[in-house]
Amino acid sequence: MAKFVFVTGGVVSSIGKGIVAASLGRLLKSRGYSVSILKLDPYLNVDPGTMSPFQHGEVFVTEDGAETDLDLGHYERFTDTAMSRLNSVTTGSIYQSVINKERRGDYNGGTVQVIPHITKEIRERIHRVSANSNADIIITEIGGTVGDIESLPFLEAIREFKGDVGRNDIAYIHVTLLPFINTSGEIKTKPTQHSVKELRSIGIQPDVLVCRSDRNINKELKTKISGFCGVHAEAVIPALDADSIYSVPLSLKKEGLCREILKILELEDHQCDLEEWEALIHQLRNPGPSVTVAVVGKYVRLNDAYLSVVEALRHACIAQNASLNITWVSAEKIETEGPENLLEGIDAIVVPGGFGNRGVNGKITAIQWAREKRIPFLGLCLGMQCAVIEWARNIAGLKEATSSELDPNASHPVIHLLPEQQDVIDLGGTMRLGVYPCRLTPETMGHKLYGEEVVYERHRHRYEFNNSYRNLFVESGYSISGTSPDGRLVELIELKSHPFFTACQYHPEFLSRPGKPHPLFQGLIEAAQLRLPATPQEVFKNTLPNFQKNK
C-alpha cells in the first residue's frame, strides 16, 4: 500500500513548496522508493492552458497532453519520472467534475456541498494517482498559503485523508518562513508559530517543518520552534537560500528531511545514492567559459514564462562544462531598435514558443540576423514557424508569406491551421497536445544529434508547416530533417549551410533533465562554444547520450 506525504506552505506565497516536494522526491528515489508528485492548485481555471504567462508562468505539458502548472516540470526534472494529467488538479476541475456528476444524477437528488462532495472528489483524485502510478510514495503539494480562503477545501480534504489510510501511512510537511529583522539582528519565529496555529485550527498538526531562511538556524532556535509548534526538534528542518535549486536536495538530505519522513511513515531508511547528483552540482559550481544565449520572446518580463527553456539551457551547459549567461531580449524591442543594437556579441539565439501577433516580426528579424550572421539558432514551436516565414520572405521569394494565425487572408500562408483544428471553438485543452512520434531523416544534423530513427516529443500547437510550399522550400535549400511517421507533418527543419540552425514544431525543453540534457539544446551550446576564443573543439565531436532510450 502506498504512503502519502502532503506539503503545505505558510506565511508567504512562492515559498518554495514545489522545490521542497521535488527535492523530497529525489531523495526518496535515491533510496530506492518510487514516487509520484501531484499539485493541487486552488484557482477556478480548469487548467492553466488559457492563463496569461505573466500571471502564471509557463504551461508545462505532460506526456498525455495535459496543460499543467510549471511545478510539474520541477517534479519531472528532479525525479526523472513522467507525470500525467492526473498529477495536476485545480479547483476548477474539481467543481467541473462534481457539477457534471450532479447533472447526471449521480448524487441521487442529494444536496451537493463542499463537504462532503468537493472534499471527497479531491481525495479521490489523490487515490487515483496512487492507483495509476503504483508508486511507493505519493507526494502532494497544496498550492496557495495556509489562511487563504480558496485553499480551505484542499486543506480539509487532506485532513480527512487521515481517515482513508492509517496514521503511519501519512505525513504532513509545512514549509514556512523565518524572517530576519535587520534592526534587531534577530530571526523571528512568530510568523511560523502563527502559520502552524492556523493549520492546527483546520485540524492538521504538521509532522515536519521546513523553515526557509537566509541564514543559519541554531539549535536553540530549533528547540524554540519545536516547543511552540509541537514538532520534534529533529523535524525542524532548516532550508537556507541556495545557489541553485538543484543543490536543495543535498541541503535537505544533510538536514535530515528524508530520514524524518521515512521514520514517520515507518519505512526503511535505505542507503542513499546521490553520487551522480553530487557530481552534477560540482560541475554546476565549477563551470568553464561563459556562453551568452539570447532568448528572444514576448514574455521576457517574467522569466518563469520560459522556465523549462532556461532549465534545458542550464542542463546543456552543465554537460558542456559552460557557464550560462542568458540575455533576455524583447521581440518587440527588436522591431523598434533593430537586432544590431540588441543581439551584437551573442553566442547563440533561442526563439521560444508563443501565441498571437505581438512581437512576431521581431522574432523573424532575430532569426534573419542569426541566419545571416551564422549565429547558432534554435527555434521552438512558434520559433520554427517564424523561421519558416523568414526563409519564405527573404530566400524563397514569397514577400507576403506569413501564418494564417497572423493573417487569416494571407496570400502565402506558409504556416496554416491543422486540419483537425478547423472546427474547434473552445480554447482550453483543444490544441495538438502531448507526445507524438517524429521520424528523423538520415544524414541530417537532427538525426546525428538524436542518434535515433524515431523520437517522441511533446507538442502544444494549432498551426503547422503548409505542405503546399514544401517543394519550394526544399528546392531553395531548406532541409526537412524530421516529420510525423506518415510524412504529413513537418516537425524539424535545419539549414545544412549554417553552423547550427535548426527549429522544431515541438517543445524539447519539456524532456530535458539535469543529468540528461536534450540533444537539441546540447548541440546548440556546443555550437556556441565554437564561437568562444580558445575553445578548440569540433561541433558534435562528443558522443551525445542516447537520449530517448535513457528517458
From Swiss-Prot:
CTPSs have evolved a hybrid strategy for distinguishing between UTP and CTP. The overlapping regions of the product feedback inhibitory and substrate sites recognize a common feature in both compounds, the triphosphate moiety. To differentiate isosteric substrate and product pyrimidine rings, an additional pocket far from the expected kinase/ligase catalytic site, specifically recognizes the cytosine and ribose portions of the product inhibitor. ATP binds at residues 14-19, 71. HAMAP family: PyrG. One of its GO terms (cellular component) is cytosol. NCBIfam families: PRK05380.1, PyrG. InterPro entries: Class_I_gatase-like (IPR029062), CTP_synthase (IPR004468), CTP_synthase_N (IPR017456), GATASE (IPR017926), GATase1_CTP_Synthase (IPR033828), P-loop_NTPase (IPR027417). Residues 1-267 are annotated as: Amidoligase domain. Mg(2+) binds at residues 71, 141. The active site is at residues 381, 507, 509. L-glutamine binds at residues 354, 382-385, 405, 462. Belongs to the CTP synthase family. CTP binds at residues 13, 148-150, 188-193, 224. Residues 292-534 form the Glutamine amidotransferase type-1 domain. GO terms for biological process: 'de novo' CTP biosynthetic process; pyrimidine nucleobase biosynthetic process. This is CTP synthase. Pfam families: CTP_synth_N, GATase. Allosterically activated by GTP, when glutamine is the substrate; GTP has no effect on the reaction when ammonia is the substrate. The allosteric effector GTP functions by stabilizing the protein conformation that binds the tetrahedral intermediate(s) formed during glutamine hydrolysis. Inhibited by the product CTP, via allosteric rather than competitive inhibition. Homotetramer. GO terms for molecular function: ATP binding; CTP synthase activity; glutaminase activity; identical protein binding; metal ion binding. Keywords: ATP-binding, Glutamine amidotransferase, Ligase, Magnesium, Metal-binding, Nucleotide-binding, Pyrimidine biosynthesis. UTP binds at residues 13, 188-193, 224. Pathway: Pyrimidine metabolism; CTP biosynthesis via de novo pathway; CTP from UDP: step 2/2. Catalyzes the ATP-dependent amination of UTP to CTP with either L-glutamine or ammonia as the source of nitrogen. Regulates intracellular CTP levels through interactions with the four ribonucleotide triphosphates. Its EC number is 6.3.4.2. It is an enzyme of class 6 (ligase). It catalyses: UTP + L-glutamine + ATP + H2O = CTP + L-glutamate + ADP + phosphate + 2 H(+); L-glutamine + H2O = L-glutamate + NH4(+); UTP + NH4(+) + ATP = CTP + ADP + phosphate + 2 H(+).
